[in-house]
Each structure stands twice: as structure tokens, then as C-alpha cells.
Amino acid sequence: MKDWHGQMPERMVDDQLEEQFWAQSITRKKTGQTDPYAAKIFQEIKKSIQQEDSVLEIGPGWGNYTFPLAENVRQLTCVDSSDSILSYLQNCMQEHQHVSYIHAKWESLAENEVAAHDIVIGVNCFYRMYEIKSALYQMNRLAKKRAIIGMTTGPIQPHYEILYKKYGYDIKFPRRDYIEFLNLLYEMDIYADCKIIPLERVYDYESYEQLVTTQSKKILNTTFDRAHVEESLKPFIEEKNGRYYYRHDFHAALVSWEPK
């Protein structure tokens, strides 16, 4: 997907850069560490899955859903384009003999490379895929009982709305959203269900400088006034014992359907 300047993001077109990103990301993770907000999403996913099911997970990343899936299904297959990710997951789940791994891009998966599974699921894994409809066809083809797409969505952190509306900055608002998937599925004659899940994330910063620097990254302008950022952040920040906390309410969407 093209960025706000009409260019393909480097990580989308450069497999080596993407691999470096994941290799570096997992070094900063404690073994088995997941994002706290993912637990609430998984509780909704779990409602569609039975203990005897086989599940195929697309782009598991550092295991937000992989780890709980492994504890709740008969068979789990993880498909990811990153060697680093698959090695990390294998290391974390050595005792899980019912989990297998396929190193491949989902959209390039050969027709006979993996068997159909009861459930096919992918959460926040579509950002590098050019042909989204082809990816959806692949999900529909390989799911025997249900296909599930998960995606975290807006609203964006509220101080960016102030920077946009009050100060006129160009902001990197979320672009690919669950509505796009619903529309593409509709074009495929699939009437999908959609569940919106309210979520909360608390960003924790060691210093004020780290807070301001991190929460300026979605400003697209080449220059900006730091005072504007600080003023926009002020209503949303709590300082406690020298650390800074920013609570952000957002949502996840679960789009799912019975395969046709």
C-alpha cells in the first residue's frame, strides 16, 4: 500500500528490511511477551473456535494470538514470511508438538503447500500485501468452517486530532481499515459479520523527551513547532514518579465469514 507521499513504504518492497525489522523487534521482547490489549481480542476470537479445530494463522508476528491459540486448538499452522519470527515462535513453543510452521508469503502460497484447516485467521497482517482480494480468496479457499480477519483501528491518538484541526498539520491517519475488507468481501459475494471491540492502551515513557519524540512521529510535515505538540499532548498525559503515561482508547474489528 502506498504511503501518504504516493510511494511504497520501504518495508513493503524490501524483504530484507522487513526481516531486519522483525529480528530487531523480537530482541526487545521478553520470551513469550504479548501486547496486553490482544487478550481482549482473543476472547472474541475464541468464541468461533472449538478445542478440536485445526487453525491456520497468517502472519503471527510475536505471538499475540499464536500462544493462546496453541493452548486451545488441536492443530495450529503458522505461515509467515519472516525467518526470525518463525524461529522465535518455535523457540517459545518447543513443547507444543501440534504446532507447525511454514516460511512463505501468504499471497504467494502454492495451492498444495498447505491443507485446508477448520479456521483461517489473520490479525494485523495485511500491510505488505499488494493484492488483498487474492489474499481473501486464499483465506476463503483454505477455511473449512470460518475465516477471521482482525484489525486494530482508530481513532488515532487524540492529540493528533488537535494538531490537525487547530494547527493545520498533515497527519498520518490510519488508511487501510476494516471497511475496505468488508467491501472487497461483498464484491466476492461474501456477506461477512463484523464485531467492533473497544480497547485501551497505556503508553509508558521513561522521560518527557521520549514522550514528545515518540508522539510526534505521525506528523507528516518536514518541520513543526514542538510547542504545538506539547500543548496538544497536555490534556492526555499523566506524570507519576518521573514517568509519563498516555491512555489511548481505540478499537479492533473482527471480520469473519463462513467460506463459500
Labelled PLM ranges:
Residues 1-49, 52-61, 148-173:
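Conserved class I S-adenosyl-L-methionine
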Residues 133-148:
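A short glycine-rich, Lys/Arg-flanked "PGG" loop and its adjoining helix->strand segment in the class I
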Residues 191-260:
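Conserved Class I S-adenosyl-L-methionine
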Residues 173-189, 195:
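Short alpha-helix
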Residues 62-108:
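Class I SAM-dependent methyltransferase SAM/SAH-binding core
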Residues 119-131:
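A short SAM/SAH-binding and catalytic strip from SAM-dependent methyltransferases
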